[in-house]
Design a protein with these regions (language model features):
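Conserved, mostly hydrophobic/aromatic
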Residues: 20, 30, 102, 112, ...
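C-terminal beta-strand-rich structural cap/linker in extracellular carbohydrate-active enzymes
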Residues: 343-365
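Short, acidic/polar
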Residues: 87-103, 210-215
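The substrate-binding groove and active-site-proximal loops of carbohydrate-active enzymes
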Residues: 1-10, 74-91, 108-117, 160-168, ...
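Aromatic/acidic polysaccharide-binding cleft in carbohydrate-active enzymes
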Residues: 187-254
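Carbohydrate-binding surface patches
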Residues: 282-324
């Protein structure tokens, strides 16, 4: 009995969302608006909602990798910007009702898969329609592999967060900052040390201190950060979006929950750490040391972040004019680890392997 099973499923989702809310958590849902599976019910009931080629066959979506189009063979492309306006209205109403349905069950946000492939016109309709019902609903755009101009476009369409590519940056090459500089200040971004498309961080690097360092760097760099369950415990088994289930829980290789709490507390205390704004790389002329200065969007706050990227060797850094850099004579050390009681204008400091320092100043103080 399909209706009975649907009722059970809805009750389960609603109960899950309620239990999460009671623990201070909000449930987000992954939605795919660009395409459907090849056996979707929509294909049976509304085949004219799909894009067709010249031979009348439904098109399959895909992506460019190294200049080659990789077709997603088990998926079918929706025609979200149909030239037939009646059809377009049908599709858009479907998506509005679809999201509303799950909001009524308790879902508080949506991670929009391949958001950059969906016509911006649809997002400009859909997001305001949903936020009229509940302004607190969060929309995150999956924007990996898309151009900076598209990120700005999606942000203007109403997305609360876009995803950045800091995960793949070695903190040296220019490509990331070149892309980031084109849209920073126009969108809030979400960083991540691992996700369902990558190897587990612990599998790649294996060390607790490295995990803490990268989490800190990404957290301080981006307005927000996301982790997959198990990152905090050093899980090593790659996530599979189809087959991973609770039986894949691992013993873990380390526990960095306290360190994550400390970094999150610092992040929630200072406004500048909750936005994407102007960043200037501070060159220490040392490949082991990564540093940057950030100025808040309102110009009132500044930070200097310095990290030792080496896992085995400590390194000394020198900053001769910190007060001038941060435009204040009252600079605080707000690092998640060891903190200096008093921060001088001239700093000589020995960074331990994987140590991250963050100095904060407020204009005029």
């Amino acid at each position: 009995n399909l209706e009975a099973e649907q009722e059970k499923g809805n009750a389960l989702i609603s109960e899950f969302c309620s239990n999460a809310n009671a623990k201070g958590l909000k449930v987000m849902m992954d939605i795919v608006v660009n395409h459907t599976s090849f056996d979707s019910e929509l294909l049976m009931t509304n085949s004219y909602w799909y894009e067709h080629d010249n031979d009348g066959e439904i098109k399959k979506p895909g992506t460019l990798e190294d200049g080659h189009f990789i077709e997603w063979g088990d998926l079918l492309q929706l025609d979200n910007l149909s030239k037939d306006l009646d059809t377009r209205r049908e599709i858009w109403k479907y998506w509005r009702d679809y999201l509303t349905y799950y909001i009524e069950l308790g879902v508080k946000g949506f991670r929009c898969d391949a958001a950059y492939m969906v016509p911006t016109e649809l997002w400009k309709f859909l997001i305001p329609e949903i936020k009229k019902q509940n302004p607190e609903i969060i929309f995150i755009a999956e924007t990996l592999n898309c151009k900076p101009e598209k990120i700005k476009e999606l942000s203007a369409a109403g997305f609360d967060f876009v995803m950045n590519s800091i995960k793949w940056w070695n903190y040296k090459d220019h490509w990331f900052m070149m892309d980031y500089s084109k849209w920073m200040g126009t969108a809030n971004s979400l960083a991540f040390p691992e996700n369902h498309d990558t190897e587990r961080f612990a599998k790649e690097y294996g060390t607790k201190d490295k995990a803490i360092a990268i989490y800190a760097i990404q957290s301080y760099f981006s307005s927000s950060i996301a982790i997959t369950t198990g990152f905090e415990y050093g899980f090593t088994k790659k996530i599979d979006v189809v087959t991973t289930n609770p039986l894949d829980w691992e013993e873990g290789t380390y526990d960095i929950t306290n360190e994550i709490k400390g970094i999150n507390k610092t992040k929630s205390t200072y406004k500048i750490l909750q936005e994407d704004s102007k960043v200037y790389i501070y060159d220490f002329h040392n490949n082991k040391v990564f540093g940057y200065i950030r100025e808040s969007n309102d110009g009132e706050e500044n930070i200097l972040v310095i990290a030792n990227l080496c896992e085995t060797e400590g390194v000394e850094f020198y900053v001769p004019n910190l007060y001038n850099l941060l435009r204040s004579e009252r600079v605080l050390d707000i690092s998640h680890g060891h903190r200096m009681e008093r921060v001088a204008d001239e700093i000589n400091y020995y960074l331990q392997p994987n140590e991250v320092k963050i100095f904060y100043a407020k204009k005029g103080e």
